[in-house]
């Protein structure tokens, strides 16, 4: 995996996060190393903090993310992405928790940021 590809995807993700008004911790070094803790922060933002409509939609679909352990949280996210949003991750839950696979995690995070924004817009139209 090239350093250029990692840097490019990291910049793209940062742009999406700015669009989403993400104001929490941004540690590029952690992202580029594949640190699962940094990615968990991002996923908490995407699925719990970004939009009240998204949060409600998740609960209405039977997911309980707020009190879930990290493992359960990620398992539920992967299931939700596949069953509710038609997205199948190339990354496994097991690999998500390994401090590697940075490009796959960046790709997943970027894709999820786009999917969540699209879903939030569709929920705002219907509510």
Kindly give the residue locations of the regions a language model identified.
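Eukaryotic interaction-scaffold segments
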Residues: 1-127
